[in-house]
Each structure stands twice: as structure tokens, then as C-alpha cells.
């Protein structure tokens, strides 16, 4: 069953990254920990970066769902709490470098999620050129927040952090969220 196998691979990676530096984790280690063959691993993922990024995608997808978050402020609070709770994983994930790095994935997936929410509120229209610039800066800033949070640079609770991050969002996008009809379909 694909769901169980994929979950086993993701869970294996999560166990490994709590005890092992990201750069030292190999596909072979993940396969052994998940008890899957090489062909099974590659049926689901192309490399360890994709496994790591699939974890964050699952977390963001979970919290961005309308039944869990009512707006961007709620989402920021949930993600900050999650990051604080899983600090060790975030710190090790931030060690990844290159095109498929965790940092690049956070930026790209956050940007695409904000774009999807905006399009859902604007009958398919995306960002204005100014909003595109603002969201680009905001999403890059979110990456820096995660990196600094992983290094325990902030002595701040999730609610206060969410308020501060929400205030930094582009004003024209702050109040957009999934429209009611999309929320009821999810």
C-alpha cells in the first residue's frame, strides 16, 4: 500500500535526522531504517532531499487546511509552534545545501502556497508586480526565521511571533485565505 510505504520512509528519515547530521544521512540508511528495498525507495523519492522536503510539505499542507488555520496569522502560529517543538529536526534540515536544500524548498513551497491562496481569492489572478516583490521578500524572510529559530536565536512564544510575522505581510494579502467554498470542499 503506497501510503504505508511512503509513511515508513518519511518516519525513518525523521528518526535518523534526530540523531544524525543531514549530510551524513544516506539513502541506504533511510532504506535500512524503513525496511524497504532500493527499488521501493526510488519508486517514491529520488533522493534524501526529496524525503526531507516531503516532510515539510506534509506539515504545511496539514496546517494550511481551512479547518486548522483561519488565516495567515494562525498558520504562522502553528508553524512556529511546530518548529519549536521539532527544533532538532529543523536545525539539522537547515544544514542541507544546494538546489534541493530545505531552505530553498521552504521558500518555493511557501511562495506557491501564498500564490494559490491569492488566486483562489481573485478568480485565478495572481500577485500584482508589487505584491510579487513583497511576497518574495516575505518568503525569503520566513526561511531566515526558520534558520534563526533552529539556532534558538529567538526567545519568543509562538503567538507573539505569529503576530509579528502577520504584521510584516503585504497588507493587500493579509486578509486573504481559502474562500468558503474551497474550505468546505477540503
Summary of predicted features, one role per range:
Residues 77-78, 99-125, 129-144:
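Amphipathic alpha-helical packing segments from all-alpha helical-bundle domains
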Residues 148-186:
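C-terminal peripheral helix-coil segments that are non-catalytic and often amphipathic
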Residues 90-94, 118-122, 149-153, 176:
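Secondary-structure edge/capping motif, primarily at the C-terminal ends of alpha-helices
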Residues 25-26, 91-93, 102, 158, ...:
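Short, hydrophobic secondary-structure boundary micro-motifs
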Residues 2-14, 18, 23-27, 32-35, ...:
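An amphipathic alpha-helix adjacent to DNA-recognition modules
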Residues 18-20, 126, 151:
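Cytosolic nucleotide-binding catalytic cores of signal-transduction proteins
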Amino acid at each position: 500500500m503506497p501510503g504505508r510505504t511512503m509513511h515508513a520512509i518519511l518516519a525513518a528519515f525523521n528518526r535518523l535526522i534526530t540523531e544524525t547530521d543531514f549530510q551524513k544521512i544516506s539513502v541506504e540508511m533511510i532504506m535500512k531504517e524503513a525496511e524497504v528495498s532500493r527499488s521501493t525507495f526510488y519508486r517514491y523519492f529520488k533522493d534524501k532531499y526529496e524525503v526531507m522536503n516531503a516532510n515539510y510539505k506534509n506539515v504545511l499542507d496539514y496546517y494550511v487546511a481551512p479547518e486548522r488555520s483561519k488565516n495567515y496569522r494562525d498558520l504562522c502560529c502553528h508553524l512556529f509552534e511546530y518548529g519549536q517543538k521539532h527544533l532538532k529536526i529543523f536545525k539539522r534540515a537547515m544544514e542541507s545545501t544546494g538546489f534541493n536544500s530545505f531552505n530553498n524548498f521552504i521558500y518555493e513551497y511557501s511562495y506557491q502556497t501564498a500564490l494559490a491562496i491569492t488566486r483562489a481569492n481573485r478568480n485565478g489572478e495572481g500577485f500584482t508586480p508589487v505584491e510579487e516583490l513583497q511576497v518574495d521578500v516575505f518568503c525569503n524572510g520566513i526561511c531566515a526565521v526558520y534558520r534563526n529559530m533552529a539556532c534558538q536565536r529567538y526567545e519568543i512564544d509562538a503567538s507573539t511571533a505569529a503576530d509579528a510575522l502577520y504584521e510584516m505581510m503585504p497588507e493587500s494579502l493579509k486578509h486573504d485565505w481559502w474562500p468558503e467554498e474551497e474550505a468546505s470542499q477540503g
